[in-house]
């Protein structure tokens, strides 16, 4: 039973598809920057979903063009919400990228599991405990490969 | 194997969500508060762009929160990336077209940016859109001449006072015995530039704040990138 | 006077915007701005709390009556948590002065403002905005410690919280597409007809997982041990003590007002049980103080979710009592961990070095486990009686898990207490024994004093909590407060 391919279905499928692709990307990626990009995709999907929540076929943008009788207008509230959500997304992404720059300078990698391992090692070293085996990669006590001597950037190692 | 499971899971999730969202009445939303706002907004806020009256009137506190989020992100990025910037000697200067074009475009972009901000209550556009154009205008010279520096102290001054004036306009309403962030000075001249009372002022604050915030974020990222 | 409520959000934001500029002009002046604003906020809220008629009221922001505009809803519960946000912000104020202090203090002001907003706001999307503000300010403050591990923990938290906000927005889109409104009171009116279906359930699940990230809900709490181990103790105390409770409060409000499906409560109950099991067992295995506290906090939040799942808000009193109790205890314990961080084995002999801290630790542990007559006992007792009164097997399973978790909790807390009271090993010099002292010990002492005061005044405090819970439970009161004249006809 395949439903008819209406514009309605296409738009909803796009919104939900983008959200799903983004979320799947976050879960499946091993590179931290790709995870952030996947989040951007997912956010685009939900923003489309929000706009759709107030959309009408027979209506114009909610701006008065003349006094007197008005044509039907789309719901202005979701548009305002999307504006807010987009700006919030931009702020979070910029912050994410700046943290990623620092991590890359310190750990010389952006691989998700390697960063997690090094973080666990760092936390354990600060606390002075034997390292807990990582929850996500229970492969026993893997010795960490040494950070390559030739760093990607010599200048930004410490701020 | 793990990837396959993940993909199957994601696909199933997508289908489930689609099935659920199919229950929504598309193209004919309930518009419970939407139509009420459409009916009342021109009289209550004096703006012909109803999205503007939602952003700066009905949901002004959301906008304030969103400005705070941008501010928090910029401040956090500042904390993370630090203050000291090594000079960007390694990056090559932009080509002739970029440098000359940047010089020509800068005043034009400033004009357009401010135009969009000031007409936010009349036409599509407003503080966010205009602010982004302003930020781009300031970022362009940075692309053309990587050595150029933005004045971070000036930017943070604009950041601070633009955000503060948004709140102060809101507090002014409170001081007059009205509610916090209530629009003031509404005149009965719908469609004119000076029609929406304090809304254009709020949008000016939003535009300056967004512009300064984004410019400082971008230049910070660019300068750290340059130091690599 | 009620209009001044908006000031408790607006003034911290104003202070945060201006702080970096003012600090450049005069540091000596700038350092007092934040505490002064928060103290004023405490004064406003305390005044409303003491002189008000204890009747809930609603403030329409921008003068636009809800549901068109956004309103702040202040019942005694919301006021209590808003007051707690400002007060804890003052207690955990980042006093440290260095070149970054302006930014750090600005972020702290933003965090407090957002927390206050979370407690007071009566609009779904507005809650989302404040929720994101809390998140971004937290990222900045965690990353501010500047270690590599802190950056890694922040980015992992940021990505998880990004998933959360995507889901939250999705849930909001579903709700708005179905009902056409965002105001919680308005939604409460429309929910029985429009949201008691699969769509409503899906929206609830999206919101639950999305907001659950901050509430340390079971599957989305992997950030908790990492962030609490890398952030400063003061920040961890604020996050574990207050922010998690606020996220929980939002879920509770949504459950009470909008989503009445039995499935919703069951999902919360199951996730709560899983949270208790995973949290307490991980805490038992932990070899480090802060990690132990972080996992134990996951377990405690799981208990709160179990209490929340009781039908028709019967668990309201238990949720309230447990949440406030955990707020005090966890804040105190994290302050002790400030001096006692690191491996548990290093703590041997520290009772002799700082007897007051050891005494406080034992006091907090006893109350957390639920030793009468400490307040923890009464909080847990309320939950046990409510759970035992249920007939459904899932609730009884929750009760069993809860009782077993208490035993595990006692095991790991008293193990630490035993280590503390052991004599120091011979080979260690006295200055190697970690000492808890200074400001953090004083703060922990403050929480300990509060706990003892509550123990002495348990009867009036209990009565007061009962009125608060009854008021928060009353859906009709909520709706009638937001739409005073014409209930039901709010278009």
Residue ranges and their predicted role:
Chain C
Residues 34-41, 86, 109-111, 205-207, ...:
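Alpha-helical transmembrane segments
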Residues 26-38, 152-162, 354-358, 438-444:
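Alpha-helical transmembrane segments and their helix-start/interface "positive-inside/aromatic belt" motifs
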Residues 33-49, 162-170, 361-369, 446-460:
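Hydrophobic alpha-helical membrane-insertion segments
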Residues 231, 343, 351-359, 413-491:
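Cytoplasmic/organellar membrane-interface segments at the starts of transmembrane helices
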Residues 132:
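Short phosphate-coordinating micro-motif centered on Lys-Gly-acidic
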